Amino acid sequence: MSSLNTRARAVFSAAVEGVHPDMVVRRGLERHGDKLHVGGQSFTLTNNLYLVGFGKAVLGMAAEAERIVGDHLIKGVVSVPHGIQNTLRSHGKEKMLLESNSRITVMEGAKHNLPDTDAQKSAECIRDLASSLTEKDLLLVLISGGGSALLPAPAPPMSLQEKQDVTRKLAAAGATIQELNTVRRALSLLKGGGLAQCASPAKVVALILSDVIGDPLDLIASGPTVRSDSSPEEVWAILDNYKLSDSLPSSVKEVLSKSISGQGSGVKNQPQEVKDNVLNVVIGSNTIALECASRKASELGLRPVILSPGVCGDVRSVARLYGLLSSFACSPGKEPPPELAAEILKLGPEVGIESWDLCRTMNVLVGERKEGWGATCLLAGGEPTVKLSGKGRGGRNQELAMRVGLELSQGEVKSGAVFLSGGTDGQDGPTEAAGAVADGELKEEAASQGLDTDSFLANNDSFTFFSKLSEGRRLLNPGLTGTNVMDVHVMLLPPSPQKDLQ
């Protein structure tokens, strides 16, 4: 393994460590005596603290929060994925589990990341706790990815099955994710600010670990502490647009009708005092992970540049962009060819990257050529997509690494660049790996071992490919991390040939 390969792995590890549940809670929540400091505000603790949480990472968050607040915590309930306590235990992550004398009740549900009756019971317990609070109380809400499925609370008289049927039909009809979330929030007691409304007049502090590009508070776990700006009329318009209004169950119509008349709790119209009593703080995100990675890169003697935390779109386009950026950085001569810059800027919108971010990044790469800074560490993150055409085993990170490796192998002279793509949760698709590391030698290495890259890609079989290639040495295997802020991309670019010409 090359020196750049080793450093790329170290940079990725630093990104993940920086958004571990205990780490983000320690950074976001400080206690000095009976004062709790969070998000620039201070709250007085008088044995008046309650805690609720929902999401795949909240168990570790809750364990650290309880360590910080101590005996001021009266009671708590967290809704977590089915089997997660045993999974964490088997992966040696006991630190993410609650102590045996914890005041927090752990409830498991949402098998296969789908709302179910177990998760609904958890949501009811969370709602009951929030509804019991007074103006003297403080409710700490812990939220992470997967929280929406772990907090199903259909507005009565609607059943969970009826609510799921509506959203399933909308999805099948081609509704956008924004439209789905608008309807989902409208039909829920707790989403779209409903939990904050239940807890009123208590003060509410939400600590959020974001797994959504751009960290939109209303979309993370469907925004239980964020007032929904959608009107009942908007919800009806969406249902009308997809010709579902007439076929709605009577219970769903009743919920929406009550919302229009102001009697229900579907679409939330929170009074000002509820909004004033809520503090939402994003304590972990892809941006924070990239900042931690950047610091590690500097320690390792690399020059870091953060491209964007919002990379999305098809992995083929994303791979092409990284290939172009490598060519731009490593092309011989005093200046990169201007047509490369034009192609990079043209591709940016397809993969969710602003032109300003691309121009800023290219300026840094040009500066490296002129000043001879040494190796550059290009950092990005997000959630690209893969169009499935085969039935192999793989994930978007392994497929992206594979495709970037093929991009880097093009041309007469290999740049020496190294690319890593990894999921911060430690699991890329239905595989044991988080991702993989690739470079310009990938295609030649595969061919020498009788592996046809094109056939593996056609079958979406990137995990099998990397497992067979050089005995799996290119795979990224951090194990279960207990966190999730989407993916991290690391591309290490060696000094340009121009440095050697000076």
Curated annotation (Swiss-Prot):
Q: What processes in GO biological process is this protein linked to?
A: protein phosphorylation
SUPFAM superfamilies per the record? GckA/TtuD-like
Which is one GO molecular function term here? glycerate kinase activity
Keyword ATP-binding part of the UniProt annotation: yes
InterPro entries in UniProt? GK-like_C_sf (IPR037035), GK_N_sf (IPR038614), MOFRL (IPR007835), MOFRL_assoc_dom (IPR025286), MOFRL_protein (IPR039760)
Cellular localisation: Cytoplasm
First-tier enzyme category under EC: transferase
Alphabetical GO CC annotations of the entry are: cytoplasm
Q: Which reaction does it catalyse?
A: (R)-glycerate + ATP = (2R)-3-phosphoglycerate + ADP + H(+)
Keywords on record:
ATP-binding, Cytoplasm, Kinase, Nucleotide-binding, Transferase
* EC number of the protein: 2.7.1.31
Report the PANTHER family cross-referenced here: GLYCERATE KINASE (PTHR12227:SF0)
The UniProt family comment states: Belongs to the glycerate kinase type-2 family.
Q: What is this protein called?
A: Glycerate kinase
- State the species of origin: Danio rerio
